Swiss-Prot record:
Family to which the UniProt record says this protein belongs: Belongs to the polyribonucleotide nucleotidyltransferase family.
Protein name, as recorded: Polyribonucleotide nucleotidyltransferase
Keyword Metal-binding: yes
SUPFAM superfamilies referenced in this protein's UniProt entry, alphabetically: Eukaryotic type KH-domain (KH-domain type I), Nucleic acid-binding proteins, Polynucleotide phosphorylase/guanosine pentaphosphate synthase (PNPase/GPSI), domain 3, Ribonuclease PH domain 2-like, Ribosomal protein S5 domain 2-like
Catalytic activity line of the entry: RNA(n+1) + phosphate = RNA(n) + a ribonucleoside 5'-diphosphate
Region (Disordered): 699-721
Species for this entry: Anaeromyxobacter sp. (strain K)
């Protein structure tokens, strides 16, 4: 096959889509290039459907090869290891964008693999993977309803930029990744520095317009590859008569169940209705072995019709009756309770409860040694702020094995972390490494938003001087024709059965994090404006409830948290603190029980829960790094006697020479006539040359002391007063 290339211009830069050159045995493969960043994306789908499942078995893997940036992995085996957080999050971005576009009922195992094979240190590769996934699926025979395309939108200096460079992103106050089709925004994920709702909407619409050339390029690529026919598959059965019977037997019962407030009560009743449905159909077929056998064979189909009844009733209840599960109104938020400081030995803690969703959140303050070190294409990255989200099975009343965090947990944690990172203090004001852990105690929707709220309270309880409190709210959308309902603080059912999951986090001043997944087309600007305005009102209500527990950061950190003090020394004196083989710094940390971190610029951070120990370590460091001042008088110790003079230690590690002529104003035959080793002597610094050699004078020190009527002897190693 001759390689085929198509180019699209986005944000003033060309993006190349190429197929037919590599990975030709994949059902679809596309090479995507922006600058010198290249991502290879492949799509393969099994020939036969996977039996016995009620979901679409799609797997998306995004992987970054370190050779792409000219780096050798730092692991023992020098191979890439488990996926990094960025790889996991990018895999989720692609999955969330593409999954809703596959044909309903298609259940063949499908895998999309995006591999970064070149990285130019300027153009990020996540949006290339997103566009490449759509292109690979679009040119294949897999029943995919694309194309879509990905773009990153940033606001730099007040101007919106499509696919900004890494340098531009560092200066941006808004940074979102989004996927869009010709007429709809499909997915949004990003953060901001307290921007307004109007700015966010402009960014989303700007991004949707920016991807249109990429959609044209994908259509052109598909046409050039022969417009492969989509493979056929068995669509879901639709027995109109059986569907109507299921509805007749369950509609009123479902109506009653959705009026129950308590989650497990409601779920229990809905499960009972399903059993009653199957039993009613079996009773109707009693005595007819063939009908009974048919019901047994079609049980999965019957359950599917029952799920459709639940779906239809809940949406009708919301759009027609303007009533939600449990009787709430469209903008109503569940009851909120907050508690802080409930874990006595933890640096900061909170318990945030909203309805039947509850998060127990703890904050730990650490030192620079606790930073997370991550090897990435851009080099070694150090994270000083982390938020980890855990979703144990007991939170939803289930029994499961406890495993390491999955993609969902990593994604929820990243969303909450991004929301709070925007208000974290700069390192020079608060030099701590901060770890926030959110454990979900119970869940019925919006647990990631509970983590944001609980995380904010926990940070304030720990005394972290955040810029402003942050809250999060999950919004939903039900759209039936012209009937539209926008829901605040959605439940799990409303998320599952709705058309949009829209999470918005921020302060009273603006948005700090956003995540949106839209399952339908045609979400207009008016709908986005209404949803964001309603989210802002809900966010402010939640902030008010949080303020009842704690309205601002505590004035001091926990008694059990390390106290960090930072001092500055001359960079060339760093070696004096470290000592040969680290001997000196190890001795200081062992004697004081402190943790010491030294930066190349001479910043020295000393940490310990005991402030007295910090001061002790500072005194030792000051002693090692003091600079001799010309004209100052010091009390020193004679370390060595020579024919021409004496070497005197004026403070630890720093010696100077008293020439024999500077011992006294009288002639001295031998140095040993005046001084002996180990003797303390008052000396004055008379010069320090370029190489750092110090000349001392005893006679000038004595003369100066005689002139002072009330002079006092200085402490050893310190200047005389």
């Amino acid at each position: 096959m001759t390689p085929i290339q198509k180019t699209a211009t986005v944000g003033g830069k060309d993006i190349l889509l190429e197929t037919g050159k590599v990975a030709k045995q994949a059902h679809g493969s596309v090479w995507v290039r922006l600058g010198d960043s290249i991502v290879l994306v492949t799509a393969v789908s099994a020939a036969e459907k996977k039996e016995g499942i009620d979901f679409f078995p799609l797997t998306v893997d995004y992987q970054e090869k370190l050779f792409a940036a000219g780096r050798v992995p730092g692991s023992f085996f020098r191979r890439e290891g488990r996926p990094t957080e960025k790889e996991t999050l990018t895999s989720r971005l692609v999955d969330r964008s593409c999954r809703p576009l596959f044909a309903e009922g298609y259940s063949n195992e499908t895998q999309v693999i995006a591999t970064v094979i070149s990285f130019d240190q300027e153009n990020d590769t996540d949006v290339l993977a997103l566009t490449g996934a759509s292109a690979a699926l679009h040119i294949s025979d897999i029943p995919f309803g694309g194309p879509i395309a990905g773009v990153r939108v940033a606001r730099v200096g007040g101007q919106l930029v499509a696919n900004p460079t890494l340098a531009q992103r560092a200066e941006a106050d808004l940074d979102v990744v989004m996927a869009a089709s010709r007429d709809a925004i499909v997915m949004v994920e990003g953060g901001a520095q307290e921007v307004s709702e109007a700015v966010m909407i402009e960014a989303l619409l700007f991004g949707q317009a920016a991807v249109q050339p990429l959609l044209d390029a994908q259509d052109a690529l598909r046409a050039a590859t022969g417009n492969k026919a989509r493979r056929s598959f068995d669509p879901p059965k639709n027995d109109v008569e059986l569907r109507a019977k299921v509805k007749a037997l369950t509609w009123e019962k479902v109506k009653e169940a959705y009026g129950r407030n308590e989650k497990h009560d409601r779920y229990g009743r809905l499960s009972e209705i399903k059993k009653e449905l199957l039993q009613a159909l079996k009773d109707e077929a009693a005595g007819d072995a063939a009908k009974l056998a048919t019901i047994a064979l079609r049980e999965k189909e019957i359950k599917g019709y029952y799920e459709d009844v639940k779906y239809d009733y809940m949406r009708k209840m919301i759009t027609d009756e303007r009533r939600r599960i449990g009787g709430r109104g469209m903008a109503d938020i569940r009851k909120i309770t907050c508690e802080v400081g409930l874990l006595p030995r933890v640096h900061g803690s909170s318990l945030f409860t909203r309805g039947e969703t509850q998060a127990l959140v703890a904050t730990t303050l650490g030192t620079a040694e606790d930073e997370q070190r991550v090897e990435m294409l851009t080099g070694m990255v150090f994270k000083k702020f982390m938020l980890h989200y855990n979703f144990p099975p007991f939170s939803v009343g289930e029994v499961k094995f406890l495993r390491s965090p999955g993609r969902r947990e990593i994604g929820h944690g990243a969303l909450a972390e991004r929301a709070l990172r925007a208000v974290m203090p700069p390192e020079d004001q608060f030099p701590y490494t901060v770890r926030v852990v959110s454990d979900i105690m119970e869940s019925n929707g919006s647990s990631s938003m509970a983590s944001v709220c609980g995380g904010c309270l926990s940070l304030m309880d720990a005394g972290v001087p955040i810029k402003a409190p942050v809250a999060g709210i999950a919004m939903g959308l039900i759209k039936e024709g012209e009937k539209i309902a926008i829901l605040s603080d959605i439940l799990g059912d409303e998320d599952h059965l709705g058309d949009m999951d829209f999470k918005v986090c921020g302060t009273a001043a603006g948005i700090t994090s956003i995540q949106m997944d839209i399952k339908i087309g045609g979400v207009t600007r008016d709908i986005l404006e209404q949803a964001l305005a309603q989210a802002a009102e809900g966010r402010k209500h939640i902030l008010g409830e949080m303020a009842k527990a704690l309205s601002a950061p505590r004035g001091s950190i926990s008694a059990y948290a390390p106290r960090i003090t930072t001092i500055k020394i001359r960079p060339e004196r760093i070696k004096d603190i470290i000592g040969p083989g680290g001997k000196t710094i190890k001795d200081i940390t062992a004697r004081t029980g402190t943790s010491i971190n030294i930066e190349d610029d001479g910043s020295v951070s000393i940490a310990s829960p005991n402030q007295d120990k910090v001061e002790e370590a500072i005194k030792m460091i000051r002693g090692l790094t003091q600079e001799a001042e010309v004209g100052r008088i010091y009390l020193g110790t004679v370390r060595k006697i020579a024919e021409f003079g004496a070497f005197v230690e004026i403070f630890p590690g720093t010696d100077g020479l008293i020439h024999i002529s500077e011992l006294s104003d009288k002639r001295v035959k031998s140095v040993s006539d005046v001084l002996s080793e180990g003797e303390e002597v008052m000396v004055k610094v008379i010069s320090v040359d370029r190489s750092g050699k110090i000349r001392l004078s005893r006679k000038e020190a004595l003369a100066d002391s005689a002139k002072k009527s009330e002079g006092t002897e200085p402490p050893k190693g310190e200047p005389a007063k």
